[in-house]
């Protein structure tokens, strides 16, 4: 039994950034460096590429403190994607909860075997720690890659189908799905909770991870179908001597009834604040557009002030819980990038092969008179100003800011707001601007973002 606090907390290499100083940066291991010209080809899109000194130097220049990695646990794409020769690029289709995703390792490590892949991940985490960064993992314990009844039998379905997956009360053969992914792990069963906690402890203690972001966390806290902050799984996280001292961030919703639970998880959990996201977008985008047309906007100054001051209506309801529990963001992997919020009024997900039915239609986005890229100087100026306003609001508000990788230089996904299948140039960051001899718009925005982060650090 290795359940002690000393292994992780006693290692001086862990930065242990206070919540009040934390600036989170969400990135995809492959997409961040797949096009990185500073890396040799064999390191691009890999754990080793992310750990390269030049990569870390860029992140240091930006000023963020905590790197949140999209899922890096071993994954398997859903059958319907495989049949279309597509992959689940984001990785929210976990196959192995104790194993890193091998495809993000260098070819040399993959050929050497699982041990070499694991070591490459450990080396990446250590390099980030030495550079001053915390490493937070996005983890998916709400469902598995086995999907619904039509999905494959790979592991849990074959081991103990009735125990691992939640069932409807009226028909035990029917899966109860609150994730939108075909199945839901049943955290009312003790062995499921134990399995998840052991997995988290492995990543924290053996790999060196500093925190976790829990996908669709409302699902993890349902008893008899209803959300409760007193769920045994949440209690297990709070009370564990190792995990209870790490950063734990909840995505406080799921697809089930009464699934939106922002602000309700309590201490010690932080939560993604969708109210901040929607308020900031509305205030600087759709309301500005309405005002120009002589209409009244949706967002009052009082509502905006509440978000600027830490969303006390959501996160000051428990004694000792403050604004840092609010993870503020304007954009994340799931949705438009910040730049695309100013270029596209409508989603453009045709490349996903689902006839543009996938992805949210509720984006609070505008296009300033032209859908997509535009060379008109007035429209360009309006878009740049809106981006700066949103990033300024994000980085200077009370709470814990989270920046989407690429937003600091105006990255676009060409209007795709659900790029989960796009393992290509759509999601791979374009770094050409770094090597331009001119004062590009990307460089200007990067410099502004880094100054805002520096100002935040000096203030808080």
Question: Which stretches of residues belong to each language-model region?
Answer:
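The feature marks proteins involved in alpha-glucan
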Residues: 1-28, 33-45
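Active-site rim elements
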Residues: 9-14, 186-189, 220-224, 317, ...
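Substrate-binding/active-site clefts of carbohydrate-active enzymes
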Residues: 30-208, 216-242, 247
